[in-house]
């Protein structure tokens, strides 16, 4: 029986795993250096059903993630959490032509058979959108999906770790390294090497530098992401505005009290750089203002910068580290990490606890991405 688990990396995967393991009464220690976490810089739209990505394995994963959110919120509510970080407010996806909208609508209706959480699906004119979001001026039509939601990734991770600590988990804001003793992986913090029944490696793009010293090749690369936090003075209830996925990479996420997030960039050549790029930020801001001119009067209250992890085929992986008996790993979640990450964290918690996962994980095996050299 698993009694003692280490989790290295406290983003969405690690925080979810820590929370679930702590609820099982397992001794959990979380290690996280707290630098560049992708979760804190993620836009936070939970609406995978409208994606036109053709990879069925990816869709299966994000669809499970989206369906898992209400269950996770119920657990936090039972723990006494009142300010929940996730809410189903609906989603708009914008397309240039009616033909493009019709294609997405047909796909959403087809997927709703297996994913009833999608809810109501209908095409809207720009005028329809402006009735919900006053001042909206984007000329594109939109498809509305009532099941779409938004999540504040930073708040979610904070709450999960807080609840895990209340359940007895320990959180160490420290950078650690790994050591292999035969097939067992141990954690080194300073001069001390600690042994655990299970070690969960969930450090995102940093998993490469964590595992490679043990003699592995790791197929993971970093991608820089930036988003803008804005505050708008308005009498409108922005908490009920749907999230908006514009044509291209820009999303607009309304939150309560006039808080608006705009993002995010997808920068493949910046490595682990975390310096805000004003040119890119201003470009995103101008693009958002073209759709919602009231943002021109908004106050920029912050900038979030993080590092996502990608694999060469853009599919996440999670499961046992090859040639070990107690280590589990997850990475490569990319820009949909907030959607898939909660489910991957749940699956890893079950694996680390020695339980049946109840989900077909073979297609996501780390063996395709983490290899002994």
Each language-model region and where it sits:
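Core beta-strand elements of the Rossmann-like FAD/NAD(P) dinucleotide-binding domain
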Residues: 190-198
């Amino acid at each position: 029986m698993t009694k003692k688990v280490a989790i290295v990396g406290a983003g969405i995967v690690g925080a979810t795993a820590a929370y679930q393991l702590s609820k099982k009464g397992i001794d959990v220690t979380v290690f996280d250096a707290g630098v560049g976490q992708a979760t804190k810089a993620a836009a936070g739209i939970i609406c995978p059903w409208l994606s036109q990505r053709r990879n069925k394995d990816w869709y299966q994963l994000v669809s499970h993630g989206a369906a898992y959110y209400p269950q996770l919120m119920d657990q936090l509510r039972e723990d006494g959490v009142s300010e929940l970080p996730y809410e189903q407010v609906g989603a708009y996806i914008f397309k240039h032509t009616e033909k493009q909208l019709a294609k997405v609508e047909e796909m959403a209706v087809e997927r709703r058979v297996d994913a009833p959480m999608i809810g109501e699906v209908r095409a809207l004119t720009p005028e329809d959108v402006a009735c919900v979001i006053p001042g909206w001026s984007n000329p594109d039509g939109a498809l509305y999906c009532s099941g779409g939601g938004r999540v504040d990734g930073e708040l979610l991770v904070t709450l999960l770790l807080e609840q895990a600590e209340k359940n007895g988990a320990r959180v160490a804001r420290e950078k650690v390294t790994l050591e292999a003793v035969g097939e067992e992986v141990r954690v080194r913090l300073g001069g001390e090497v600690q042994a655990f029944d299970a070690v969960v490696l969930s450090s995102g793009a940093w998993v490469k530098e964590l595992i490679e010293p043990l003699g592995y090749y790791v197929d993971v690369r970093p991608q820089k992401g930036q988003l803008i936090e804005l505050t708008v003075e308005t009498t409108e209830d922005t908490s009920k505005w749907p999230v908006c996925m514009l044509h291209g990479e820009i999303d607009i996420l309304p939150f309560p009290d006039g808080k608006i997030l705009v993002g995010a960039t997808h920068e493949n050549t910046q490595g682990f750089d975390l310096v805000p790029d004003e040119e890119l930020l201003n470009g995103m801001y101008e693009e958002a203002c073209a759709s919602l001119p009231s943002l021109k009067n908004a106050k920029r209250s912050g900038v979030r910068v993080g590092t996502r992890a990608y694999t060469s085929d853009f599919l996440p992986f999670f499961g046992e580290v090859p040639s070990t008996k107690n280590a589990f790993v997850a990475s490569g979640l990319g820009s949909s990490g907030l959607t898939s990450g909660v489910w991957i964290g749940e699956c890893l918690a079950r694996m680390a606890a020695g339980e049946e996962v109840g989900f077909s994980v073979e297609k996501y095996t780390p063996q395709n991405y983490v290899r002994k050299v």
